[in-house]
Swiss-Prot record:
Keywords: Cell membrane, Membrane, Transmembrane, Transmembrane helix. Belongs to the EccE family. The keyword Cell wall biogenesis/degradation does not apply. It is a single-pass membrane protein. This is ESX-2 secretion system protein EccE2. Could be part of the ESX-2 / type VII secretion system (T7SS), which is composed of cytosolic and membrane components. NCBIfam families: T7SS_EccE. It is found in: Cell membrane. The keyword Transmembrane applies. InterPro entries: EccE_dom (IPR050051), T7SS_EccE (IPR021368). One of its GO terms (cellular component) is plasma membrane. Pfam families: EccE. The gene is eccE2.
Length: 537
């Protein structure tokens, strides 16, 4: 798909143009200075056209200086239907772009097996996407980009930094989403598109086949609508790409400064890509793009409050002069050509994780640390916690540390006063605080009619039921509270205290006995006693 109407690839055309440039300079030098002038002109021409300076020839740097920092703006996506199912598509510059949100497997545990290694079965092998670039009737995609974005912890308040220190050095994502962005070129598929209703409908059908293929592998996937495409671009920094605050080394948007780096060809591997989630940044955007010729590229965009002075890793190369184009390559639009990026052959395996790592619970019997997600991007989640306050409050504040906005609905606000923080609200009404993503309620047994006061019931009830209901709700009960089998099936995650610091965790059909990790830095959030500051003398 890189060939042009001339029949030559862009690289061949540039090589021919470079030879002609050197020839013209040599001829001019010969006319002005004879043999010495010709030799000097050839040396200067080769240095300007062919010699690599910091990864690119001098003429390429000149082009970036003149044209690299331009705002990138696209048409609005539209909604089209195919096979009685609708989806969003953007047609821009001869390319139709569609997207699929990869939801993966719900509530799958992540185990920390070492100081820099984690294990999870909620993953996707990018190499397996290569066959999905070709479709019936010789329809071929330009590329598929696997865009993963999120952050290790929250960015508001003091506790997220404490939680980050508790996690330590392993790769961890408190928030993480994965999207597949597919680009269908029109000119390169002229023959195949003759048999299609429209370019947009053909792109929608491609996205539907990709989503169906992923579902057959047990990975939930959802076709994006036009609203989803626009919202995804906004979250990935479309304001920075379309704005004028563009520097040579970074671009600025409403959420902060964005700097994009390229992975060298020899560094693209599963282990290296996972290390992106060790970075302390407001947000990390990782982009792995697969091409039909079995090659790939990888970039990482880091969002920080101020421009990053140096790359976060020695293996990363900053894409100077083309930061806006590099950030636009993460979005739902035509993929721009990045001069500072080189393709490499696909490795035998290139695994990347899907969804958040989860909330830190504690240690297993073999010494591994267990993390369980309490939220899910695709479905509503219910979590049951039967434990005393020293454990229940730790779980709640760790959800905040992971980046969620929590609202506690309680009639006993003094009980929860110690956990109050910027991203955790305590209310006594059913209406949650604005932008709440996780609700916390207290468990109360339903009493039978004519009961003599004993708390025996037939079902789960809560003291205050949040309305409207957040996507995830955590129900807090006293230790020893038991659930009937029917009620237990209503919860995706259960955490039950069986000893002073031991809990039984159940999620996704699996069960673990975990020793809860009690960090001293969290004591001020779980204690009922007021915390005072002492001034050293």
């Amino acid at each position: 798909m890189t060939s042009k109407l001339t029949g030559f690839s862009p690289r061949s055309a540039r090589r021919v143009a470079g030879v002609w440039t050197v020839f013209v300079l040599a001829s001019a030098g010969w006319a002005l200075g004879g043999q010495l002038g010709a030799v000097m002109a050839v040396v200067v021409g080769v240095a300007l056209v062919f010699v690599q300076w910091w990864g690119q020839p001098a003429w390429s740097w000149a082009v970036l200086g003149l044209r690299g920092r331009r705002p990138v703006k696209w048409n609005d996506p539209i909604t089209l239907a195919n096979n009685r199912s609708g989806g969003g598509v953007r047609v821009q510059d001869g390319v139709a772009v569609v997207a699929v949100q990869l939801l993966g497997r719900a509530h799958r545990a992540t185990t920390v097996t070492g100081s820099v290694t984690v294990e999870s079965d909620n993953v996707i092998d990018v190499v397996e996407l290569a066959p999905l670039l070709r479709h019936p009737l010789d329809l071929e995609l330009d590329s598929i980009s696997v865009v993963t974005f999120g952050s290790r912890t929250g960015t508001v308040g003091d506790y997220p930094r404490v939680y980050d220190a508790e996690i330590g050095t392993p790769p961890y994502a408190g928030r993480r989403e994965t999207w597949l962005i597919m680009r269908l070129p029109v000119i390169g598929n002229t023959q195949a598109l003759r048999w299609r209703t429209s370019v947009g409908a053909a792109a929608i059908s491609v996205a539907q086949r990709v989503a169906s293929s992923l579902r057959c592998q047990g990975l939930r996937a959802k076709l994006a609508t036009a609203t989803d495409l626009a919202e995804l671009d906004r979250r990935l920094g479309s304001d920075a790409v379309a704005g004028s605050a563009q520097r040579w080394k970074a671009i600025r948007g409403e959420a902060g400064w964005m700097t994009t780096y390229a992975y060298p060809a020899e560094a693209i591997s599963s282990r290296v890509l996972s290390q992106a989630w060790t970075l302390r940044a407001d947000e990390v955007i990782q982009n792995v793009t697969v091409y039909p010729d079995a090659t790939c590229t990888a970039t990482i965009t880091v969002r920080t409050p101020t421009p990053a002075p140096t790359p976060p890793s020695v293996i990363l190369r900053r894409l100077n002069g083309e930061q806006a184009a590099a950030a636009a390559a993460n979005m739902c639009g035509p993929r721009p050509h990045l001069r500072g990026q080189r393709r490499c052959p696909l490795p035998a395996q290139l695994v990347t994780e899907i969804g958040p790592s989860g909330v830190l619970i504690g240690k297993l019997s073999n010494g591994d640390r267990l993390m369980i997600p309490v939220t899910d991007a695709g479905e509503l989640s219910r979590v049951f916690v039967a434990a005393d306050d020293t454990i229940a409050k730790r779980i709640v504040i760790r959800v905040v540390g992971a980046g969620e906005r929590v609202c506690v609905h309680t009639r006993d606000q003094e009980r929860w006063a110690s956990v109050r923080m910027p991203q955790l609200s305590i209310v006594g009404t059913p209406r949650p605080a604005p932008r709440t993503t996780v609700g916390v309620v207290e468990y109360v047994r339903r009493r039978k009619n004519g009961d003599d006061g004993k708390s025996e019931g037939s079902g789960v009830d809560v003291a205050i039921s949040p309305t409207p209901r957040p996507a995830s709700v955590i129900t807090i009960a006293r230790p020893g509270t038991s659930l009937s089998e029917s009620d237990r099936h209503g919860f995706e995650v259960t955490i039950e205290q069986i000893d002073r610091a031991t809990v039984k965790v159940g999620a996704a059909g699996q069960n673990w006995l975990v020793e809860m990790e009690m960090f001293r830095a969290e004591n001020r959030y779980v204690s009922l006693e007021p915390v005072t500051m002492s001034i050293g003398r």
